[in-house]
Swiss-Prot record:
<feature type="compositionally biased region" description="Pro residues">
    <location>
        <begin position="14"/>
        <end position="23"/>
    </location>
</feature>
<dbReference type="GO" id="GO:0106310">
    <property type="term" value="F:protein serine kinase activity"/>
</dbReference>
<dbReference type="InterPro" id="IPR016255">
    <property type="entry name" value="Gcn2"/>
</dbReference>
<comment type="similarity">
    <text>Belongs to the protein kinase superfamily. Ser/Thr protein kinase family. GCN2 subfamily.</text>
</comment>
<feature type="binding site">
    <location>
        <begin position="500"/>
        <end position="508"/>
    </location>
    <ligand>
        <name>ATP</name>
    </ligand>
</feature>
<dbReference type="InterPro" id="IPR045864">
    <property type="entry name" value="aa-tRNA-synth_II/BPL/LPL"/>
</dbReference>
<feature type="active site" description="Proton acceptor">
    <location>
        <position position="822"/>
    </location>
</feature>
<feature type="compositionally biased region" description="Gly residues">
    <location>
        <begin position="466"/>
        <end position="477"/>
    </location>
</feature>
<feature type="region of interest" description="Disordered">
    <location>
        <begin position="1134"/>
        <end position="1160"/>
    </location>
</feature>
<feature type="compositionally biased region" description="Low complexity">
    <location>
        <begin position="697"/>
        <end position="735"/>
    </location>
</feature>
<dbReference type="InterPro" id="IPR000719">
    <property type="entry name" value="Prot_kinase_dom"/>
</dbReference>
<dbReference type="Pfam" id="PF00069">
    <property type="entry name" value="Pkinase"/>
</dbReference>
<feature type="binding site">
    <location>
        <position position="523"/>
    </location>
    <ligand>
        <name>ATP</name>
    </ligand>
</feature>
<feature type="region of interest" description="Disordered">
    <location>
        <begin position="1216"/>
        <end position="1253"/>
    </location>
</feature>
<dbReference type="InterPro" id="IPR024435">
    <property type="entry name" value="HisRS-related_dom"/>
</dbReference>
<keyword id="KW-0067">ATP-binding</keyword>
<feature type="domain" description="Protein kinase">
    <location>
        <begin position="494"/>
        <end position="1027"/>
    </location>
</feature>
Length: 1700
């Protein structure tokens, strides 16, 4: 209900009008006075006075309303400008009369305008705006004379009482402003009111209490935090002062402490050396002389614990180790502390020696357990270890590694991993050497090592070197073992055979699979802790997994393992020590902290240096000093270990396979063949040899790895320093601080080798396991580089074959979007069959990301290219030196500048970030320039930075160099450098090369062109004439010749193979899926189509058929498929009549081909053009099991045309054969004379009878011209599917054709049928127009524009025809830019195609153009001026442009007589697309007036030329037969003087079959009608059943009457009623359930769509029947006997509701 103040506001506007003004009163007095003067006694009546007053009042009101309207419009514009988006217009309303207004006599109010304004208070921020309203105002017609309608609606926050109060206030204010503009003032008043009441909405008391508590708690916490910060600041200031003071004090004592520590270390080292010397002598004496001492007892305890642990399971190992510790502790109580430590060291030292000996023996398969036991006995006699320890040398014991792990867990840098001994056990040689040979080799190696090192060969010396290096070696060995709980997939599945190659990235090993026994190549790559580098490494795996080609190395699988076990590839040569420095024992033995006890304590104390005591500091200093003294012994032991390993590994002379020799037969995916960094492109430094370059690549890659490791440590060091400083401030421990400072300074004075080894040691400690990537690939025995170096002793054809294989492989790689970037002979391999395999995709990248490499990708690229790319030694070394200086100077700077605190750390971090950015930039630049010397293109040298991006043409440049090396052999390496440099820079070939290999030289020049755009792609190279033909191509051609010959004996075998079911299962799932999910566009073909689709199709077809029946059209069906006549159609428009068919059918199995020996179809205008249209949309070609090609019809009109042509060809053959018999009869009569008159008369009688039944072609055409054939057809046409295995696309189409008449009336009738059809359809009537043009006018247009090329015509016409949907400037842009047409030519096109309108309007424009253009006003024939149409006698176009316009005028007259609206036919000259489909005359389209301008139908004249000339035949046999016939005819004419011209002209003349027709896309029509019908259905159904989901989806017809029953046992009654109705001709239906529920029957009756529902009810013994009319909503009671009579008398029409 509206508020009461609103009613009050309407009262002023409803007051009676004011009295008339004085002018009106004077007018009334004048009227009265004039009446008195004229009439004398006559007085005016009351009616005249009232009428005069009414007129005056009306004129006054109209003038007033006009003035007020202008004033209202001005106010509305001002308000809209002021409030902008807050002003919204509304529809005005009329307040009708109610009881109150009728009683008071107030007239209804009519508003002229109504609007709404959003009012907010005067608040700047929306967050503080808590209230807002909508002020709705309505202007009466007499506003502002009367009050406006004002209404206040709450938008936000304002209570309803306040809104009523504001509305009353505004009404009161408006009463005082009558006659003036007031809305803006009212808005200001409303804003003031809202500003006063702009309060935050009130909430509950609990919420207010909670919010208040939160505010108080926030304030309290803020105060506490401020106090805590203040206290912390004071404490920091106090600690800073104390620390500064202590720092200065410690600095004064620094020099003294330094000297004391040196003296202390020297003294301790001397004492320890003397003690060790005495202790070792004692041990030797005890073991050699045989006295049993406490030490032996202790040793027996150890042996017991070890043996016990060996016999038990793995779970008892901890107990064994605990027993060992307990026994150890018990024995130590009887001795001094120093002796107990030494005894423990001796026991562990002996165990370590045994472990090292066992590991060394595992690498030699010729060593047996007997050999090891003999060697152990000799070592026992020397006193190296106890006899009870010999059990640890058992190579088949798998539990020993766990014992070593428990004993040496304090000395190992990483946890022990188990080594798989089962693999090595299988490789033991049964025919081993004798023990003497093995033992002599062992001791000879030891003697040689001691001689080289200058030491004595005493047992004490060997024992001491084992002590010094044992820890290091043991640690190194521990790195190469695997956890017993982790099974190595690599060692369990594969057996290593040979190392094929090694690079900076990893190794490639030849292995044998233990399961299948085949050989493979496995690439082992060590992964980095940096995830970005790992992603770069894994890029090769991803690339290989995408490639599957016969000339690309096959990829099998890849996996990652956490570590790598010992194998022949792990003990590398000297040049690989730097590559795997973290795994080599030599690199660890170089470290000074290699002793077991000292190394452990130093590592523990260095991690807890801030919390350690002064005593631990002294111990650490002692041990570090000892490490410096023992460094020489460690190096000595390292040399011994290396020499010993080489003897064991390379005893058979196979050490050469592990070297980086580039001249051997090694196979490497990471071959460093002439690797280089293009930024340092120095050829003189690369001449030294391949081995030197390869070694440099490995060393530089090592430097890059060291640089990355150091950078990672440098990132973590500031954080560690910061945490250390915080601990110092809290603990205030100046001693630990001074200790750290002294420690850092002592470390900075160590040599560079020691600092590098210590950094390696830290990296090893941090990483518990290092993952390896294994890539299993195809094993190839040879590489192309071996052949190019020694010379390819092959025939020229074989070299071309190999080159073609390389090109095919690169074409496939480039087709996958991959750039190899490192194509060279070392990366091209041969398989076992001698075919090419392209490999090493370590540098391959995606072609799309070449020009936009991210910094991360560039960094990764630099890492991945280490295998085939040598970096700049100067640049890399400078970066490494900078990093080392930073690591050395950073601790000093930190402790010297510790006063500056956090500021110094921030500066260091900023410097580190800047250096890292510079390093990334350098790496990005270097990475972009990847490749191999002499094989990189100029754009590769320039890199990818900036605008010089490269693509797959860089591989083609490399291919050119490779191709040159395949034809030319270099005598020396120096010659190779000079020749390749001249070839790259100057394009100069060696002498006699270009003369002997001219084709090769041309091809090489193309490939190494400096402009990438001029280089051919791999696909273009395969198709080039410079490439010799492929042998496989010749095989294919020969096979095609065989299988296309039906007389060949293998022809039927080939067909049986093609039609076998071996491959049908590959496409069966696609076929069945399409059958089940994608229904055909022909709705009648769908078994489960919905109800409305079937109804719409039936109704539309009935409407069209009704219209066609009125035009006397009959249904004539054409075959859906036919024998194909042209497989590859070559558009040959306007051929000469004498020319034969371009292509003919390859088989002669049909009767049609046999019977058309003298009658062929001339491939002239329409046939070729129609075939071209078919080619564009795609024909559906099928083949039967006999090899016959069949074509599914593409268009109903084309099918009808082919059908007519075939019928007339058969007619011509029949007519010719008939007259041939007549000629024979006449010939017989002339020879026999008149001997038998009776027989002659009978024969003439038969001839006359045959003449009456046989007609010629021209006679039939003459009859059809008077009464043409009108036919229609509803059918389906097919299009070629887009995917293999799918069904051809099926479309519904309707066509109407008029055959036999050349008159324009047939064209007009076709368009008349078109308009009647679309006018009868509700979805298209008044929403379409006919787009008309003439074929002859289009041809004149092309002649006027100056375009003669047929292809260009079709392309331009396709663009120009889009003017109905696109503006001219868009079409003009395409013509200028895409087709490159001159501007004048485009302007000429515009003068034609922009002309459209009704037929009279366009004719006026064309007449004017004809007068101004001599080309159009001439009388020349179009056919004579058009070369493409010079002999087309069948074209029915006029000879001049004037005649063409007369045709259009005549057509317009026909339209007028047929009552076709002139506005429905648009003469559009831009409609020129598909004009080649039509041969002559009119062509038109039916276009919807909607935005998309969709085409629903096309039509026009497509006459078919028919040539019955027997001189042109499709086969030689027919030509010979026809020539014989001609000779016989000529002889007959000459001999008998018979006039044969009549008969010869009957079939020696070209005929024209006139056809005009219409094709309608029924799918589009069905869709539109279905949508409209569905809307009507939803309106008819109740709201509860109006949804599509509740409608019947699987029913084929709609009943008119539906019978239901309410009660049991009425099923038979329902069936009886349905039967009676059906017998009477009504469509009745019921449910097929005997006793359904009433609800089910009610739903079924409604959803069925029936017009009438019969309900049967049973009340006692009586049965009542009610008939309900759904449309009229009426029910009638009908008896059982009168049901049929009821529907008969009701004039029931079953389809009245469905008429369209």
């Amino acid at each position: 209900m509206p508020p009461k103040p609103k009613q009050k506001a309407k009262q002023p506007s409803q007051q009676p009008p004011p009295p008339p003004p004085p002018a009106a009163a004077q007018l009334i007095e004048d009227i009265l006075s004039s009446d008195e003067e004229e009439g004398g006694v006559k007085l005016p009546t009351k009616s005249s006075v009232k009428n005069a007053l009414k007129k005056v009042k009306k004129e006054r009101d109209r003038e007033l309303i006009r003035q007020l309207k202008d004033q209202q419009d001005m106010e509305l514009e001002a308000l809209q400008a002021i409030f902008n988006d807050e002003f919204i217009t509304m529809d005005p309303i009329i307040i009708n009369r109610n009881m109150d207004t009728i009683i008071e006599g107030i007239k209804p109010i009519r508003e002229s305008a109504r609007f709404r304004i959003t009012i907010k208070p005067y608040v700047g921020d929306d967050e503080k705006c808590f209230v807002s309203i909508y002020l709705v105002v309505g202007f009466p017609e007499k506003y502002p004379v009367v009050l406006p309608s004002i209404q206040v609606l709450v938008n936000k926050g304002l209570p309803q009482k306040k809104a009523i109060e504001l509305e009353e206030k505004l009404i009161r204010e408006s009463q005082g402003k009558i006659g003036n503009i007031m809305i803006f003032d009212l808005c200001e008043i409303a804003k003031d009111f809202l500003n006063e009441n702009n309060f935050e909405p009130t909430q509950s008391i609990h919420h207010d209490f909670r919010s208040h508590q939160q505010k108080i708690s926030i304030e309290i916490s803020t105060n506490e935090q401020q106090q805590q910060q203040l206290q912390q600041l004071q404490q920091l200031q106090l600690q800073y002062n104390n620390d500064t003071k202590k720092e200065w004090e410690s600095t004064l004592e620094e020099s003294q402490l330094k000297e004391d520590r040196k003296n202390y270390r020297l003294q301790k080292s001397i004492q320890r050396a003397q003690y060790e010397k005495e202790r070792k002598k004692t041990i030797v004496n005890e073991f050699t002389n045989g006295p049993q001492s406490k030490l032996s007892k202790q040793q027996r305890n150890i042996d017991y614990s070890i043996d016990h642990s060996i016999n038990n399971n793995n779970n008892n190992n901890n107990n064994a180790f605990n027993n060992f510790n307990n026994n150890n502790n018990n024995n130590n109580t009887n001795n001094s502390n120093v002796s107990s430590i030494d005894n423990k060291t001796i026991d562990k030292q002996q165990t370590m020696i045994l472990h090292l000996l066992r590991l060394l023996c595992q690498n030699d398969s010729n060593i047996t357990n007997d050999h090891i036991k003999t060697l152990g006995e000799q070592l026992v006699q020397m006193g190296i270890f106890n006899r009870n320890h010999l059990s640890l040398l058992n190579m088949h014991n798998s539990n020993d590694n766990q014992i070593y792990q428990h004993i040496f867990q304090d000395y190992f840098l990483k946890q022990f991993n188990d080594i798989s001994l089962s693999d090595l056990k299988n490789n033991v040689d049964s025919a081993a050497n004798n023990s003497g040979h093995f033992l002599n080799k062992f001791w000879d190696t030891l003697n040689k090592t001691n001689e080289n090192s200058g030491l004595k060969k005493s047992p004490s010396t060997f024992e001491y070197s084992g002590e010094g290096g044992g820890g290091g070696v043991g640690g190194g060995s521990s790195q190469k073992t695997i956890n017993p709980h982790q099974q190595s997939r690599y060692h369990s599945d594969f057996e290593e055979i040979q190392l094929l190659g090694r690079g900076g990235f990893g190794q490639v090993v030849k292995v044998r699979n233990k399961l299948d026994g085949r050989y493979y190549a496995i690439k082992k790559i060590k992964l980095d802790s940096n995830q970005s580098l790992n992603r770069r490494i894994l890029r090769e795996v991803i690339t290989l997994s995408r490639l599957h080609h016969q000339h690309v190395v096959r990829y099998y699988q890849a996996w990652i393992e956490s570590a790598e076990s010992l194998s022949l590839t792990n003990d590398n040569s000297d040049d690989d020590d730097d590559d795997d420095d973290e795994f080599e024992s030599g690199s660890e033995s170089e470290e000074s902290q290699s002793e077991s006890e000292s190394e452990s304590s130093e590592s523990e104390e260095s991690s807890e240096s801030e919390e350690s005591s002064e005593s631990s500091e002294s111990e650490e200093s002692e041990e570090s000093e000892y490490s410096d003294d023992s460094e020489f012994e460690s190096e000595e032991n390292n040399d011994f270990d290396q020499s010993f390993s080489e003897v064991f590994l390379f005893q058979n002379g196979n050490k050469r396979s592990l070297e980086f020799d580039l001249t051997d037969d090694s196979y490497s995916f990471l071959h460093s063949d002439c690797g280089f960094l293009l930024e340092v492109f120095d050829l003189n430094n690369k001449i030294g040899g391949n081995n030197t370059r390869s070694m440099g690549s490995s060393n530089q890659h090592l430097q890059q790895q060291q640089q990355q490791n150091q950078s990672q440590q440098q990132k973590k060091q500031p954080q560690q320093n910061q945490s250390q400083q915080q601990k110092k401030l809290k603990n205030s421990n100046s001693k630990s601080k001074s200790k750290s400072k002294s420690k850092s300074k002592s470390k900075s004075k160590s040599n560079s080798k020691k600092s590098i080894s210590s950094s390696k040691l830290k990296n090893i400690k941090k990483s518990t396991s290092i993952p390896y990537l294994y890539i299993q690939m195809e094993y190839c025995q040879k590489i192309l580089r071996n052949l190019t170096e020694t010379g390819m002793n092959l025939e020229d054809d074989d070299i071309w074959k190999l080159f073609r294989q390389i090109v095919e492989g690169m074409a496939y790689v480039h087709g996958q979007g991959i750039i190899h970037r490192d194509l060279k002979p070392s990366n091209i391999f041969f398989d076992s069959c001698g075919d090419i395999k392209i490999g090493d995709f370590g540098l391959a990248i995606n072609n799309k990301t070449t020009s936009t490499l991210s910094p991360t990708t560039n960094i990764n690229s630099s890492t991945s290219s280490a295998g085939s790319l040598t970096t700049s030694s100067n640049s890399v070394q400078s970066v490494i030196n900078t990093k080392q200086q930073q690591q050395q100077q950073q601790p000093q700077n930190y402790w010297e500048d510790e006063v500056e605190g956090q500021q110094q750390q921030q500066q260091q971090q900023q410097q580190q970030q800047q250096q890292q950015q510079q390093q990334q930039q350098q790496q990005q630049q270097h990475t972009a320039r990847v490749g191999t010397l002499f094989y990189t293109s100029p754009e590769q040298e320039a890199g990818t930075n900036g605008d010089s991006a490269y693509d797959d043409k860089v591989d083609m440049y490399s291919l050119g160099i490779v191709f040159f090396e395949m034809w030319y052999v270099f005598s020396t390496g120096h010659e190779r450098v000079i020749v390749l440099r001249n070839l790259r820079e100057k394009f100069e070939f060696p002498s006699d090369f270009e003369r002997n290999h001219s084709r090769q030289a041309t091809l090489i020049r193309m490939l190494i062109d400096k402009d990438p755009a001029k280089r051919p792609s791999a696909q273009q190279l395969l198709q080039s004439e410079l490439m010799p033909p492929k042998m496989e191509d010749e095989y294919i051609k020969n096979s095609i010749r065989v299988i296309t010959n039906p007389t060949n004996q293998f022809y039927q075998t080939m067909l049986n193979s093609l039609f076998s079911q071996n491959h049908q299962h590959l496409h069966s799932h696609i076929y069945h899926h399409q059958q089940s999910s994608v229904t055909s566009s022909s709705y009648s073909k769908s078994l489960f189509c919905s109800l409305d689709l079937l109804q719409v199709k039936q109704l539309v077809d009935d409407v069209i058929i009704t219209i066609l029946k009125k035009h006397n059209a009959n249904e004539m069906l054409t075959p859906q498929m036919s024998i194909i006549k042209e497989w590859n159609e070559q558009p040959n428009l306007f051929n000469n009549s004498s020319s034969s068919s371009s292509t003919t059918t390859t088989t002669s199995t049909t009767n049609t081909a046999n019977n058309t020996n003298s009658v062929v179809i001339n491939k002239s205008t329409s046939t070729s053009n129609i075939n071209k249209v078919s080619n564009k949309t795609g024909k559906s070609i099928l083949m039967d099991d006999s090899g016959q090609l069949l074509e599914l019809r593409h268009d109903l009109r084309v099918s009808f045309k082919s059908f007519i042509e075939t019928e007339f060809l058969n007619l011509g053959d029949h007519y010719k054969h008939h007259h041939q018999q007549q000629n024979d009869v006449r010939h017989d009569n002339s020879s026999n004379g008149n001997s038998n008159n009776n027989n002659s008369n009978d024969r003439h009688h038969d001839q006359d009878k045959s003449n009456t039944t046989t007609r010629s072609v021209d006679e039939i055409l003459e009859l059809l011209s008077k009464a043409p054939i009108k036919r229609y057809e509803f059918g389906h046409v097919f299009r070629k599917p887009h995917l293999v295995g799918k069904l051809p696309k099926e479309l519904s189409q309707f066509c109407f054709d008029v055959f036999g008449s050349s008159s324009l009336y047939s064209d007009a009738e076709t368009i008349k049928v078109t308009t009647e059809i679309f006018d009868s359809l509700p979805s298209t009537q008044n929403f379409y127009f006919v787009r008309l043009n003439h074929f002859g006018i289009v041809e004149y247009m092309w002649k006027f524009i100056g375009i003669t090329d047929l292809t260009l015509k079709n392309e331009i016409s396709q663009v120009v025809s889009q003017l109905i949907r696109q503006p001219w400037f868009t079409v003009k842009k395409v013509l200028l830019e895409k087709f490159k047409l001159p501007l004048k030519q485009v302007e000429r096109i515009a003068n034609w195609v922009l002309v459209k309108g009704t037929i009279p309007d366009v004719l006026k424009k064309l007449d004017a153009s004809q007068n101004n253009n001599p080309l159009l006003s001439g009388n020349g024939s179009l056919g004579n001026n058009n070369n493409n149409n010079n002999n087309n006698n069948n074209v029915r176009i006029s000879s001049s442009f004037t005649d063409l316009l007369e045709d259009i005028r005549q057509l317009a007259v026909y339209f007028e007589k047929m009552s076709i609206s002139p506005h429905k036919v648009i003469f559009d000259l831009s409609y020129c697309f598909s004009e080649n489909f039509y041969s002559t005359g009119i062509m038109f389209q039916v276009i919807l007036k909607e935005e998309k301008h969709e085409c629903l139908a096309v039509g026009g004249r497509y006459d078919s030329p028919l040539n019955l000339n027997n001189s042109n035949n499709s086969s030689s046999s027919s030509s010979s037969s026809s020539s014989n016939n001609n000779n016989s005819y000529n002889n007959y004419n000459n001999n008998n003087n018979y006039n044969y011209n009549y008969y010869s002209n009957c079939y020696l003349t070209n005929f024209n079959l006139p056809i005009t027709g219409l094709s309608v896309a029924m799918d589009k029509v069905y869709s539109r009608e279905r949508e409209l019908y569905s809307q009507k259905r939803r309106q008819q159904l109740p709201p509860t059943l109006s949804s599509e989901s509740q409608m019947i989806a699987h029913k084929f017809s709609t009943p008119d009457i539906f019978v239901i029953s309410l009660g049991p046992n009425l099923f038979l009654e329902r069936i009886g009623i349905v039967g009676d109705l059906c017998n009477a001709g009504f469509n009745a239906e019921t449910m097929y359930i005997e006793n359904p529920t009433p609800e089910e029957q009610q739903d079924a009756s409604i959803t069925s769509g029936a017009l009438y529902i019969i309900t049967i009810k049973e009340k006692g013994a009586k049965k009542t029947i009610k008939v309900k009319n759904i449309e009229k909503r009426r029910e009638d009671d009908v008896s059982r006997d009168e049901i049929v009579k009821f529907f008969t008398l009701s004039n029931f029409n079953s389809k009245s509701r469905l008429n369209i």
